[in-house]
Amino acid sequence: MKDILTASWMVEMIRTTTNMYAHGWDERNGGNVSLLLDEAQVCQYLDVKNVIRTIDTGFTAPTLDGKYFLVTGTGKYFKNVQYAPEVNLGLIHLTDNGETAELLWGFADGGKFTSEFPAHMMSHAERLKVDPQNRVVMHCHPANLLAMTYVHSLDERAFTRALWQMCTECIVVFPDGVNVLPWMLCGTNEIGLATAEKMQTARLVIWAQHGIYGAGKDLDETFGLIETAEKAAEIYMKIAHLPLVNTITDGQMHLLEQRFGVKARDGYLE
């Protein structure tokens, strides 16, 4: 077997979590990431029949039965992932209609997956229906997006348009816009179900007064989605109290649609 720490997807997970911490998105043990892997990817590094222990997931997800995930651990600090990946990350195999997780590697200190695991898995299930190539769900606490939920309407169209108008690339990067949930108790199946429902129509779901969820085909794409939305929110928070002299008009955004071959979410542009 090859050394799992040399796997390209493991290296990228370590780099991404380290970068998220460096950006200030994942203070203390905040934030979590899950990466869907194919069995062929895992088998090069692990005997998939060698189960270290089983963990109850607390939910049912039949469409994810048999899937493999590399996921961050509960109570773990992203700043420590690069130094002790086998403690802060775990590779699991879902069985029993998603009700059981077989631990194949990691969580070496007896830990388990993130407390937001239900929201991650339910979001994976919904995004796979929309895009079979989806592989990543990422949650973090970017300061400006978080701040914006205190001073801006949580109406999804209005929130999306505000972000699109802050930076030319926004409508190109996330033409599907952002969906928004009002404050809900985190770490529950209820917020997991609500997030998954929102994931049906957008890859970015904001949790008001908490953070954001992003989904994508790989770690780079998902990180970039959040990074772009956060930059737009930063600009918004810097200018929201000032008189607005210029903006990106709907007509200009239609030009961006044509130039970059994207389609803005229906009804979001005039």
Per-segment meaning from a language model:
Residues 1-270:
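Glycine-rich flexible loops
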